[in-house]
């Protein structure tokens, strides 16, 4: 076999593996809600809880209360929070510093106010009136109501405390006290239903972003994904997560059960009140970016307002297999950004640095290919002489390589060894929160976390799932074709049908695979192609 063609096939096999990796990663992320889990189940026995039929009987009054309810808007340095006097719950939580595609604050709560609340508590179904609101100070806000159960009257208070340091965390305290002279509650537990519907997206955003919504849980020092029927005792936290944002809940001595209702997976926080005279439960809710700069401050007591430590919210940021390679890459990107505050340029500079570092491998591979090319006449003679004896041909080929001091895999291995670097760069560019909303070229590449756009259709094209006309995929395709031609020593006129497909078909195939990929990734790919073209010209001049 022509050795140059073997090298070319190795290159395209590597590219195929890259495309397959990205396709699988995209499919997995889009369907992560159904990910399997090998979690252990911790059984618990709660013999008596609220009667579901009793709770449903009071729902008829809900619609009247919703119509009479009042919205309470609380603004902090980072949040615009909207509460409702109906159930005293959050109905909107906007992040002032993180804008959506429409350049409005991102709303982390995505619920239908008529049918669901974000933090649904069992006691809410017994309250047949609106909650009373009290502003204690700028950071503390209280909602109070009363309810009766089995002839007994209870005072029911929800208190929200925001961080004084503008951290993406609030304290949520539930207090229930009996107002009459009796000892213990006559129920064993109450539940909090934690909605998985987070991050409200516009129609345009739904077309641009894949559905990365998932229920996650951290226990036994591992991040796991929730699944229907899973029960866990005392996890460190549970939460709902999208690609870039998360809402995470932590509580001491928490029991959690995951259930699927009407096609949506929800987490039920079960709180044991057996043998208690009153209830005073404290929850800490992180609601913000999946960015370790904000998440890790709750691991050290002195770093946060609430004195929390070892919460490990930072584990909600999924770590890829190539994490150890990603860390220094991100540090290099940050250095470039500190000098020139443009993440697109940081990606370009990082790519150049990486290509320079792996240049010895590239040079070695090209030199091995050149050495093999010199042996082509002798190899053809052997192929003609032993064309009917494959075993003898392999022996003679091996002897020829040994005599000439040539490694037939010398041109392939450098290509394969570069794959982990690409995979690490892909994971970094595809998931780095700092690239969300980061503009490279205003009016064209406005957000490095999604594809570039010069025209938005407003719908998906049926056969190719395109939502926009994009320029970067075309540039990528032509530069990929150019780098392949320059990297090869073959005469294009003498190519067979198979080789022509490798040359011209593969770049076209990758055009479709990468069309909707984040523009940050395509900038990396294009920079790599251009660098490869210049690099190969230099190598050919040097070797000649």
UniProtKB/Swiss-Prot annotation:
**What keywords tag this UniProt record?**
Cell inner membrane, Cell membrane, Chaperone, Membrane, Protein transport, Transmembrane, Transmembrane helix, Transport
Question: A Pfam family matched by this chain, by name?
Answer: 60KD_IMP
Any GO BP annotation: protein insertion into membrane
Q: Which GO terms describe its cellular component?
A: plasma membrane
What's the stated role of this polypeptide?
Required for the insertion and/or proper folding and/or complex formation of integral membrane proteins into the membrane. Involved in integration of membrane proteins that insert both dependently and independently of the Sec translocase complex, as well as at least some lipoproteins. Aids folding of multispanning membrane proteins.
Q: Which PANTHER family match?
A: CYTOCHROME C OXIDASE ASSEMBLY PROTEIN COX18, MITOCHONDRIAL (PTHR12428:SF65), OXA1 (PTHR12428)
**The protein's name:** Membrane protein insertase YidC
Gene name tied to this protein: yidC
């Amino acid at each position: 076999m022509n050795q140059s063609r073997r090298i070319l096939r190795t290159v395209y096999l590597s590219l195929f593996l890259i495309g397959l990796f990205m396709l699988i990663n995209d499919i997995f992320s889009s369907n992560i809600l159904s990910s399997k889990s090998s979690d252990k189940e911790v059984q618990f026995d709660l013999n008596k809880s609220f009667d579901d039929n009793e709770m449903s009987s009071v729902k008829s009054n809900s619609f009247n209360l919703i119509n009479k309810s009042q919205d309470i808007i609380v603004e902090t340095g980072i949040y615009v929070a909207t509460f409702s006097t109906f159930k005293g719950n959050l109905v909107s939580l906007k992040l002032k510093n993180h804008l959506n595609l429409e350049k409005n604050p991102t709303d982390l709560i995505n619920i239908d106010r008529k049918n669901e609340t974000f933090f649904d508590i069992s006691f809410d179904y017994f309250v047949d009136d609106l909650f009373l609101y009290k502003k204690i100070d700028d950071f503390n806000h209280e909602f109070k109501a009363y309810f009766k159960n089995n002839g007994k009257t209870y005072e029911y208070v929800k208190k929200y405390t925001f961080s004084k340091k503008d951290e993406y965390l609030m304290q949520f305290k539930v207090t229930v006290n009996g107002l009459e002279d009796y000892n213990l509650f006559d129920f064993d537990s109450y539940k909090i239903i934690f909605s998985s519907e987070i991050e409200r997206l516009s129609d345009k955003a739904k077309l641009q972003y894949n559905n990365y919504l998932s229920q996650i849980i951290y226990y036994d020092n591992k991040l796991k994904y929730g699944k229907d029927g899973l029960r866990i005792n005392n996890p460190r936290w549970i939460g709902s997560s999208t690609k870039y944002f998360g809402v995470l809940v932590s509580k001491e001595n928490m029991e959690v059960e995951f259930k699927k209702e009407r096609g949506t997976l929800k987490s039920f926080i079960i709180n044991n009140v057996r043998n208690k005279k009153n209830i005073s439960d404290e929850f800490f809710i992180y609601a913000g970016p999946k960015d370790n700069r904000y998440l890790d401050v709750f691991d050290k007591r002195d770093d946060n307002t609430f004195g929390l430590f070892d919460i490990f919210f930072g584990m909600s940021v999924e770590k890829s297999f190539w994490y150890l390679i990603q860390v220094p890459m991100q540090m290099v990107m940050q250095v470039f950004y500190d000098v020139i505050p443009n993440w697109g340029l940081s990606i370009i500079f990082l790519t150049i640095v990486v290509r320079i570092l792996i240049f010895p491998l590239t040079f070695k591979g090209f030199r091995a290919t050149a050495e093999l090319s010199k042996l082509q006449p002798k190899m053809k003679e052997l192929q003609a002489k032993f064309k009917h004896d494959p075993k003898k041909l392999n022996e003679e080929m091996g002897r020829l390589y040994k005599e000439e001091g040539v490694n037939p895999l010398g041109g392939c291995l450098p290509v394969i060894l570069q794959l982990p670097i690409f995979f690490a760069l892909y994971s970094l560019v595809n998931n780095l929160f700092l690239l969300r909303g980061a503009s490279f070229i205003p009016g064209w590449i406005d957000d490095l976390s999604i594809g570039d756009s010069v025209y938005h259709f407003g719908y998906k094209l049926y056969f190719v799932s395109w939502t926009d006309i994009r320029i970067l995929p075309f540039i990528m395709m032509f530069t990929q074709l150019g780098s392949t031609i320059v990297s090869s020593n073959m005469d294009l006129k003498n190519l067979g049908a198979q080789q022509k497909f490798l040359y011209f078909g593969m770049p076209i195939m990758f055009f479709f695979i990468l069309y909707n990929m984040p523009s940050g990734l395509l900038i990396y790919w294009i920079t790599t192609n251009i660098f490869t073209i210049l690099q190969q010209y230099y190598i050919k001049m040097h070797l000649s």
